[in-house]
Amino acid sequence: MEQLKILKQSCQNAADISQKRLLSILKDNAGTEYGIEHHFSEIRSISDYKKQIPFSVFDDYKESVDRMMRGEKNVLTAYPISFYAHTSGTIGASKHIPFTERAAEIVRAYRSISEEAYAEYTLGKPPCMPSAPKMLYLATAREGHAPDGTQITNFSGRFIIEHKEELQKIAIEPELIFCDEQMDLPYLFALYALKEKELTGICAPFMAAVSDFFCYIEKHWEDLCQDIEEGVLRPDDRTSSFLLNRLGAELHPDAERARELRKIFQVGLDRPIAAEIWPSLRYVQAIGAGGFSSYTRIVRRFIGDIPIHMSVYAASEGLFGVSVQMNSPEYVMIPESGYYEFIPEEDADLSETFLRTHTLEMDQLQPGKKYELVVTNLSGFYRYRIGDVVTVNGYFGQSPVICFSYRRHQILNIAGEKTHEDMIQYAMDSLKKRVHINIVEWSACADYSTSPARYLLFMETDPEIEPYKKQKIRNLLEEKLSEASEYYAHYRQEEKLGPLKLILLQPQTFALYRDVQIWNGASPNQLKLIHVITNAKTEAFFRGLES
């Protein structure tokens, strides 16, 4: 529990450590092009920094990053670049975010945090982690290179690539993680995982991947058991025969394992089955809070009370927080990973001139309130508005304990009501309690084709809802959304917002949406569902799949 111990110590003086980190960043980067332009050498205090340095977004850096990728040095940062993180492109266009060696060191320091949290969770009592764990990584690590030769990959993929020497701990063929070819990954991940009886952990960047993994097994267990019994790989249009032959050469028939699995599945899948499939399974690790909470509920159906570690609070711009407890959606901010500022939610739309000098420090936050996070990282981004709004739940020493709430620009705002994701999620959760339906996923957008404008709420359920229940469900959603947002209720009463329209979707709509995103180049590791739709193309996709 070495890193947890270090974190606990640093959090006792978190605000001071974070501020000293800022002054160190400014000193180290005073000779860069950005540092000279913004007079880093003249900054002596936090107050000076806030007066001199503007807020920023990625577009402010894009031209500089392009130059860095062509080999120019000392543009945004003097620190050596480790790699460029290719963003998923699920929010706007994809980007290449510089990630320095200094930032990578922070990630490496916390890469065993799940094991440490699990050890603290069990207090050294059984079931402890085996001495030779077998982990399933539901992730891929594909890479490219910038014009100057620097590696381009996704955030999670980079740190898999770095630790190839530990592949003996992985319960699947390394080929599946590192291969650049198209392949039927859901089938291959499920097959290799089911073959490995001694699996100890299931890891993924986001809980959606774990949910998809279990749902695939639920639907295809008969074929999977047959292939395990025969020691063959099932042909598929997405996987080349060459790759199938290469992978298949490592498979061997296992009739005994197939019999064990069939016995489990034939009893029924309406109970937690993970511990029966893998008696040594200790935990699941994935980000499963906020917009991923619905996937966490699905995974719970399969794993029962096996603990979940919510991993880290991170983005392509850096690692900002870690979960220090099992089964908790909270993250402790890491003081040494950058300098953090916080904008109160209610102030987020005030003028930048005012906000620049009125951000709050780590030790000035009120538990229960929401704040927009502003980051100065170790990779050349200064006062960067990453767009996340977080809820502060308390403190761990002096460091804030946060939960992700919503993306600042992912809101519905027709008449000034500013409805964000967690308000609609509240309505969805309340609906499930009232009518006992299984909501696979949902998305929403503003519809200006009527007067007054209204919300469109796209919802997929399993099983599908009978048409005669649709109006009742719509009315309940309207009621619960009004409970969640007094402004929504107010503007509905004043008829500045029209009645919400519920659109029920065909089965597998959201699975198809994820497949389309991957087909268009999004990384499976980073794929995040956008609950609030802000572009016409995505809206048209969902409209076209109305049930």
Where are these regions (language model features)?
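Conserved adenylation A10 loop of the ANL superfamily
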Residues: 84-98, 213, 502
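Conserved nucleotide-state-sensing and coupling region of NTP-binding domains
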Residues: 129-146
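Active-site glycine/GP-rich loop and adjacent strand/helix microenvironment
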Residues: 1-41, 49-53, 71, 141, ...
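Short secondary-structure capping/junction motifs at helix and strand boundaries
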Residues: 95-98, 118-133, 223-227, 307-308
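Hydrophobic alpha-helical transmembrane segments of membrane proteins
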Residues: 110, 117, 188-189
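Active-site diphosphate/adenylate-binding microenvironment
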Residues: 20-84, 96-102, 113-126, 144-149
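Long, hydrophobic, well-ordered secondary-structure blocks that form the structural core
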Residues: 98, 103-110, 309, 316
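Mid-sequence acidic-hydrophobic segments that form the walls
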Residues: 90, 113-121, 216, 220
